[in-house]
Amino acid sequence: MAPNHLSVREMREDEKPLVLEMLKAGVKDTENRVALHALTRPPALLLLAAASSGLRFILASFALALLLPVFLAVAAVKLGLRARWGSLPPPGGLGGPWVAVRGSGDVCGVLALAPGANVGDGARVTRLSVSRWHRRRGVGRRLLAFAEARARAWAGSMGEPRARLVVPVAVAAWGVAGLLEACGYQAEGGWGCMGYMLVREFSKDL
């Protein structure tokens, strides 16, 4: 097989540790930026200031009272992201997880899908990560095309009214957002905290 040949197949059992490390690395690449984005919004700054003021009456150290709320808030954001995207998903109705493999066996990306919560919601990407050594080489685009094909096939087999794919993206993951927009996806809301978006959702009718 050619060294640069890129294929997608189901993950093998012996590849779980490698895939898990890839997912964790993908979260680490964005978690600091997401935490910075979240904690520099005005409501978050106000809450941190209030918490620090309260702690000054309890703790003897001014520096500790100032830094402890920030540390706890950053830890909460990071733990939330790692729990959501930094672990292997359970088997879903769409099969998988799948891995992108370059050449004869170099695993360079991972993808997982799940059905939407309601009829007509289509399929959702629950995990999408590319090894940092293989980025900007078409792996993400190849996994996205595979996800679209799986979503279309699943919608047809389930009698869904439409084939649709939804991809959640952390607000700081500009490269992924750019790839999705270039492939015809549109941002349509998301979720966050205190009125500020932390994760945007991109969708496309297939």
Swiss-Prot record:
Pfam families to which the protein is assigned, alphabetical: Acetyltransf_1
GO cellular component: membrane
Location of the N-acetyltransferase domain: 6-206
Enzyme Commission (EC) number: 2.3.1.-
Keyword Acyltransferase: yes
Signal peptide feature range: none
Localization of this protein: Membrane
Protein name per UniProt: Probable N-acetyltransferase 14
Species of origin: Mus musculus
Record lineage: Eukaryota, Metazoa, Chordata, Craniata, Vertebrata
